[in-house]
């Protein structure tokens, strides 16, 4: 009877809820004040969404498409705030309000879900100390336990991540493209959390982190480097992510033979640093629009999804634990890529540089938009 009831329940779930049954949290890669005011964000929560991510591009889009920020823009400008400070105040307000909306999920899941992410300024991507200072300021200003500060997984970002975790600040490590960068982020989390535990400042179980591993951008770059209609096109992004997930299990999952340096923390109730699949909107219209969700679903993961892709997944996605199989195939595909002369190391190195620039450009565009809006509103 229990089995029949279980099957009936699963049958009646939507795809987002089915993802949860497979161990994956679905987060929304979008935030705006209009979503908060209109109740749209609450509707996503009712579908089963359990978190939100943001970046400068998302805030730029929100400012461009709505007048809901106008009153605050005028108020902060009258206070004499510069455009960087104005943006930070607007972002802090939205993230704090979103965190309050997700707080019941955070409480219900014992700190393991219900997070809202905000990014440090992209211009600090190569500055360790500047990143630490800004992350501390954002953490204090928002003052919510279910917030994550996004820090890029650059060479300068990795030591910042370790320091922030050691202070009990939740971190979303972003712009991860390579297995090596992912591994560095995971060890920074473990080392920082070990320091936090030894400091006696609090329980390790209260600190959370995700490692945002980008997917579709890898396929776009690899596809451009391959001969036309090559059999590896559209496969390397997923293969790369699967190998990163294998590394995650090697580092954190004791039941699969891993978890060495993490195990002492695990015994205190510490959370694993979950892989978060980012850049999961399909860039090539020839590919299935939910492929990066369907193929990368499995235990202890998060997928942050743009609104359009979320709608597609809810309509015709195919949730299942596909992430737990296909490692030999992924390794074979990576080997075949090298054999045709395409270096995944070069691809991911260039993607990190381009990713930092893209976010920095979006940040500059956002600041320019604030200037233009103020010129009109004054």
Question: How would you name each of these model-derived features?
Answer:
Residues 270-377:
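Flexible, acidic glycine-rich loops studded with aromatic residues
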Residues 58-60, 65-160:
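Active-site beta->alpha loop and helix N-cap motifs at the rims of alpha/beta catalytic domains
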Residues 2-39:
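N- or domain-start disorder-to-order transition segments that initiate the globular core
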Residues 48-50, 143, 160-171, 206:
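Glycine-enriched alpha-helix->loop->beta-strand junction motifs that scaffold or abut catalytic
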Residues 169-308:
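Catalytic alpha/beta core domains of metabolic enzymes, predominantly
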Residues 35, 127-133, 151-165, 178-192:
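Active-site-adjacent beta->alpha loops and helix N-cap segments on the catalytic face
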Residues 55, 118, 149, 164, ...:
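Conserved, mostly hydrophobic/aromatic
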Residues 29, 145-154, 169-181:
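Catalytic beta/alpha-barrel core
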């Amino acid at each position: 009877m229990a089995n029949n009831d279980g099957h009936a329940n699963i049958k009646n779930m939507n795809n987002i809820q089915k993802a949860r049954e497979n161990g994956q949290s679905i987060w929304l890669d979008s935030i705006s004040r209009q979503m908060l005011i209109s109740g749209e964000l609450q509707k996503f929560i009712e579908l089963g969404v359990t978190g939100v991510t943001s970046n400068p591009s998302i805030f730029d889009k929100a400012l461009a498409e709505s007048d809901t920020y106008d009153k605050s823009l005028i108020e902060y400008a009258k206070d004499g705030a510069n455009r960087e400070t104005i943006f930070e105040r607007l972002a802090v307000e939205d993230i704090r309000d979103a965190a309050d909306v997700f707080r019941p999920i955070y409480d219900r899941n014992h700190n393991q879900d219900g997070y809202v992410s905000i990014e440090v300024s992209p211009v600090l991507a190569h500055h360790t100390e500047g990143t630490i200072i800004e992350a501390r300021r954002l953490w204090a200003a928002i003052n919510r336990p279910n917030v994550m500060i996004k820090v890029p997984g650059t060479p300068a970002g990795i030591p910042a991540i370790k320091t922030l975790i050691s202070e009990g600040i939740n971190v979303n490590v972003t712009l991860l493209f390579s297995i090596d960068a992912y591994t560095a982020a995971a060890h920074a989390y473990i080392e920082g959390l070990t320091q936090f535990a030894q400091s006696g400042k609090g329980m390790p179980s209260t600190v959370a982190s995700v490692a945002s591993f980008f997917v579709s951008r890898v396929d776009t770059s690899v596809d451009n480097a391959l001969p036309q209609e090559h059999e590896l096109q559209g496969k390397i992004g997923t293969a790369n992510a699967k190998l990163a997930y294998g590394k995650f299990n090697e580092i954190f999952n004791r039941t699969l033979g891993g978890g060495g340096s993490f195990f002492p923390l695990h015994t205190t109730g510490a959370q694993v640093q979950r892989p978060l699949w980012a850049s999961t909107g399909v860039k090539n219209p020839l590919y299935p629009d939910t492929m990066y969700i369907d193929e990368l679903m499995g235990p202890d993961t998060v997928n942050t999804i743009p609104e359009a892709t979320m709608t597609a997944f809810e309509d015709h996605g195919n949730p299942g634990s596909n992430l737990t199989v296909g490692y030999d195939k992924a390794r074979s595909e990576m080997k075949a890529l090298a054999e045709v002369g395409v270096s995944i190391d070069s691809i991911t190195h260039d993607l990190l540089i381009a990713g930092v620039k893209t976010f920095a450009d979006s940040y500059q565009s956002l600041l320019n938009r604030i200037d233009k809006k103020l010129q009109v509103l004054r």
